[in-house]
């Protein structure tokens, strides 16, 4: 018999509210795992010894709380209720009302459930299987990619950065801001870091990104809006046809 859960306990307490997320994720498509770091700029709305956020199927490595870029001298512990997918972050001393940065390092698995940050694949133009990492956060699965206030009433700005192999391509909600093609060098590969512009304030379930063997067309302007078409490597001929049709609009 399945355990009966209290619906009210799925909701987060209202003592803290996020205003911006700075997210950095590094997926490894070969082993289907990812490492991540999120900095949540938040407002503590009442003096608190605990903050609760949503987490599901993530391993939490470190948690730091800063005020004005200075780490607080306040012992931190945490525990995760896997049934309710809520992590309670506990402080030795109460945190006064104010603005803070909550910085969390974590890791996870690229699942095959089409939920959160997951692994998928497709056949390329040569019939070879290609791997991708992509997202499906609606309605409450952003918590499987990064710790967050995963309720739609919380509207925040999102700054996304992705670390990936140089031969891969990625997109997110906003346009690229900066690309460092030599972000990290190892014995057998060089990784790049792609930073995206800030989004408008929005709910967590609207955040999206995809990483894989893709290419992008040149930007075209359609009725005042700049558009690109993202497509698998080797499928460019179809994009040329599509762009010719778009230009007829």
Task: Locate each region found by the language model.
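Acidic/His-enriched low-complexity segments
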Residues: 1-249
